[in-house]
């Protein structure tokens, strides 16, 4: 879902 995509994007930035 969109929320999952957002969390993934934030996670990548968090790296």
From Swiss-Prot:
Q: What does this protein do?
A: Has antibacterial activity against a wide spectrum of Gram-positive bacteria including B.cereus (MIC=25 uM), E.faecalis (MIC=100 uM), L.lactis (MIC=12 uM), L.innocua (MIC=50 uM), M.luteus (MIC=25 uM), S.aureus (MIC=12 uM), S.epidermidis (MIC=25 uM) and S.uberis (MIC=25 uM). Lacks antibacterial activity against the Gram-negative bacteria E.cloacae and E.coli. Inhibits the formation of NO by neuronal nitric oxide synthase with an IC(50) of 12.4 uM.
Assign the protein's first listed, main location to one coarse class.
secreted
Q: Which residues are modified to Leucine amide? A: 15
Tissue specificity is: Expressed by the skin glands.
Q: Which UniProt keywords apply?
A: Amidation, Amphibian defense peptide, Antibiotic, Antimicrobial, Secreted
Q: What is this protein called?
A: Signiferin-2.1
Instruction: State whether keyword Nucleus applies.
Output: no
Q: Name one GO cellular component term.
A: extracellular region
The subcellular location is: Secreted
Listed under GO biological process in this entry are:
defense response to Gram-positive bacterium; negative regulation of nitric-oxide synthase activity
């Amino acid at each position: 879902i969109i929320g999952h995509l957002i969390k993934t994007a934030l996670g990548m930035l968090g790296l």
